[in-house]
Every structure is written in structure tokens, then in C-alpha cells.
């Protein structure tokens, strides 16, 4: 697939790295020659210097023959205009990043579709929804629903009290008499393991399981932790993410929102009438003790500065907060944050990439999630008639070794996949796969 990316900033660079490993023909366009040199040193891409709001630059980038145009420049209006122009020049699909929720409302979306833009995405909104979802599943570090909620992916870290410690995967399978879940991956240190029946669980393992939706509570109990009802929460950072979280939850949860900027705190107090706004530095231990951080059920650090968020999250964990979530935009810091005990990491680039990645797939993908705690992806495919996946049982399909089928939904029936499972046309199939095998896996369902 020929893909043109407008913008060589953080988002554009991350997308370039993610998509380059899947055999795509990538071109990156930016007005900043230094940014182009940096992305060119990291990834095998064609770079074009120029402004994508100019037809001449779009033509030089080969937009007329591109399959997908992705506008991720820093200025919202530039993204919208670039996407419209690219579509008019012949791009098969054009998608754009925006910074306003207003553009995502149904009436507005129809206007943009008429203009030729296939999809608009607002990273801060996507990240806020991710946080809200995770606050409803406090024992999980990552949580995704598939097939309208019939199947779920649950990720959890094994505590010292976990009943799985020292046991093998087959031991866990034998106890799951009703076949309600399947372990699809174990992350140990920096290594992601697609487990065999003989693999043994160890303390601090990150376990990924596909589960029937009504059994997720049983699965997370295997972590050694219990779900916590969130009644009192503190948000650090009056960022777009922080404001969206507070706005959506303030009617149901007692929220304190902390921001060090006095002017911003004053404006937020006018906007969030049911949220207590506090003008303090979230890294100040004494100030946080006075604001009863230790009495919070959840702490969410979303200042936009990775270092600040990690330090504040460490403080919250030390004070005994049960659920701690931190926004970490520097991908190099994610493993550090996890190693010091931060429960869940949010990264706008990763959550947004999940929404964009499905546009690069030729197979019908209903849902795709780029995982934070692993380099892997988990996908929900809709099986086409006569596709290779329907020809054999799961054990004989010949899937890549670094992939595994977790579950199948057939109408109202839900199956946890085993070796003897037979996949039929129009089934919804949830697959866990490492990046290098994603495209090969997709071919089985096409």
C-alpha cells in the first residue's frame, strides 16, 4: 500500500515506524528539513520537504497514486485542508487529526465526509475514553471489548498473591472447566511470549487473556488483585485529556483536579462545576498529603509531561492509591514506568495508531488495538467466505508462530478457541499477533 503521511512530528514519526515494518511504500512530508532527516534516519521512507496545503507539494509526494493519506500536522486546519486537497487529487482514502470534539459530532462528520475526508481522529479524546474504560476495570492494566462486548481482552500483572504463580498454562487450562478464557501472551521483562502449555507463570509477569465477557471478573482474580469501586479520584493536569475525563465522570465520582497554573485552574473552575480544582504542584509531597492523595481510589496523571506524570504516579503508589494511571508520551519511558509499579500507561500515539492501523488492512478488521505493555496487536477479523481460515481446524491452519487465536463469536454464540475449533464464514475472530506477522495473519481471513 502506498501511504503519504503529512507531518514528521511525534505522531508522524511513530506512524512511520509502525507502518514501515508491514511492507508499505511510505512517503513523509514536512516543512521542517531537520524533522525529515530524523525520520529518514529511523525508517526507510521517502521524504518530501514542503507544505501539504500546496497542490505542488502534494503532487511531488505522489498523492495522486496513494492508497492512504494521513494528515498529522500540528495545526488542525492544515490537516483538514491537506486531507481535502489530497482526496481531490486522487488519494483513495484521506484521514486527518483534529483538536476539537465539535468536528466529531454526527452533523459535522457528515460535512467532512461530503468534503472527501474518510475519517477524523482526536487523540486526546481517544486517550480520555481509554482512561475512563480502564477506571471501570481497576485490576486490569489494559482492557478491550470485541464483538459488541461478547469477548474481552484483559491484561493483568501477577502479584505475589496470584494463584497462578509457579503453575503452567496447562494447569490453568485444566481448572477452566467451562472454557471461559485463554491466555494468549505473557510479557516477561522486555520479552513477549506466545505461551505453550508447558510455560510457567512467574511473579510480575504481565498476562494477556481473551475471555468471555461475563467471565472477566474471574480472570482478573487470577492476578491476585481485587476490583475497586472508584468513588474518589484525583486528576493531575488540566490538559485536554484531564478535562475530558473530569467532564465525563464528575457526576458519578468525587474528583479533584490539580494544576500548577493558577490562570488555567481559575478557568477550569468555571468550566467544571462539579469538580474541585486545586492550584498545586502534583510533585509536592506535602501538598498532595494535604489534599488527601492517600484517600483516593484512583490517581490519573495527564499533564502532558512524561517525567512529571511518572514522578507523580510514583508518589501516588507510595501513598497507597489503588489504581494509578499515567500518560507517558516518551515511548522509551514506558518500560521504566511499568517497572516502578505504575498500574497502567496511556500513550496517545499508541491509542491513536490503533484507530489508523485498520485503514492499512485489506482484510475486514472490526477492531484493532496496539498494546502498550507489549509490542503486539490484538485484532478482531470478520471472516470472508472461502478464506483460508475456514478450510481447517485451528490446529491445522498453519498460523505464524508469533500469533494465536483467542476467541470466536458466531452470532450469539461465543467460543474460546482451542485446537479443534472450526472457523466459519462471517465469524468474528480475535487474534493476538506480533507486528511482523500481522499482515500474514490477515491473509487467513481474506
Describe these PLM feature segments.
Residues 1-446:
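Cytosolic regulatory regions of ion transport systems
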Amino acid at each position: 500500500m502506498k501511504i503519504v503521511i503529512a507531518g514528521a512530528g511525534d505522531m508522524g514519526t511513530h506512524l512511520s515506524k509502525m507502518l514501515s515494518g508491514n511492507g508499505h511504500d511510505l512517503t513523509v512530508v514536512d516543512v521542517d528539513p531537520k524533522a525529515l532527516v530524523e525520520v529518514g534516519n529511523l525508517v526507510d521512507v521517502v521524504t518530501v520537504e514542503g507544505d501539504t496545503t500546496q497542490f505542488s507539494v502534494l503532487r511531488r509526494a505522489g498523492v495522486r497514486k496513494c492508497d492512504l493519506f494521513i494528515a498529522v500536522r500540528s495545526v488542525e486546519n492544515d490537516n483538514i485542508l491537506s486531507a481535502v486537497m489530497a482526496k481531490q487529487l486522487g488519494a483513495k482514502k484521506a484521514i486527518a487529526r483534529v483538536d476539537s470534539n465539535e468536528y466529531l459530532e454526527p452533523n459535522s462528520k457528515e460535512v467532512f465526509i461530503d468534503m472527501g475526508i474518510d475519517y477524523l481522529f482526536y487523540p486526546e479524546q481517544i486517550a480520555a475514553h481509554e482512561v475512563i474504560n480502564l477506571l471501570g476495570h481497576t485490576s486490569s492494566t489494559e482492557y478491550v471489548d470485541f464483538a459488541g462486548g461478547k469477548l474481552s481482552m484483559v491484561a493483568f500483572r501477577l502479584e505475589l498473591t496470584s494463584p497462578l504463580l509457579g503453575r503452567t498454562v496447562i494447569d490453568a487450562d485444566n481448572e477452566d472447566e467451562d472454557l471461559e478464557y485463554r491466555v494468549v501472551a505473557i510479557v516477561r521483562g522486555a520479552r513477549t511470549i506466545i505461551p505453550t502449555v508447558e510455560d510457567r507463570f512467574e511473579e510480575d509477569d504481565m498476562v494477556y487473556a481473551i475471555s468471555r465477557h461475563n467471565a472477566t471478573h474471574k480472570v482478573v482474580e487470577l492476578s491476585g488483585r481485587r476490583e475497586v469501586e472508584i468513588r474518589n479520584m484525583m486528576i493531575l493536569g488540566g490538559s485536554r485529556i484531564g478535562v475530558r475525563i473530569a467532564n465525563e465522570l464528575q457526576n458519578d465520582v468525587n474528583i479533584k483536579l490539580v494544576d500548577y497554573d493558577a490562570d488555567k485552574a481559575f478557568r477550569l473552575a468555571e468550566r467544571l462545576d462539579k469538580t474541585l480544582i486545586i492550584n498545586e504542584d502534583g510533585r509536592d509531597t506535602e501538598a498532595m498529603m494535604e489534599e488527601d492523595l492517600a484517600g483516593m481510589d484512583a490517581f490519573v496523571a495527564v499533564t502532558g509531561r512524561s517525567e512529571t506524570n511518572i514522578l507523580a504516579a510514583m508518589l501516588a503508589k507510595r501513598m497507597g492509591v489503588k489504581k494509578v494511571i499515567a500518560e507517558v508520551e516518551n515511548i522509551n519511558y514506558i518500560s521504566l514506568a511499568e517497572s516502578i509499579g505504575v498500574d497502567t500507561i496511556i500513550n496517545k500515539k499508541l491509542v491513536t495508531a490503533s484507530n489508523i492501523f485498520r485503514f492499512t488492512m485489506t482484510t475486514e478488521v472490526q477492531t484493532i488495538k496496539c498494546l502498550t505493555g507489549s509490542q503486539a496487536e490484538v485484532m478482531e477479523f470478520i471472516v470472508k467466505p472461502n478464506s483460508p481460515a475456514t478450510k481447517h481446524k485451528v490446529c491445522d491452519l498453519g498460523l505464524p508462530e508469533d500469533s494465536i487465536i483467542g476467541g470466536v463469536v458466531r452470532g450469539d454464540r461465543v467460543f474460546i478457541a482451542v485446537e479443534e475449533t472450526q472457523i466459519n464464514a462471517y465469524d468474528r475472530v480475535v487474534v493476538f499477533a506480533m507486528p511482523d506477522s500481522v499482515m500474514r495473519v490477515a491473509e487467513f481471513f481474506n
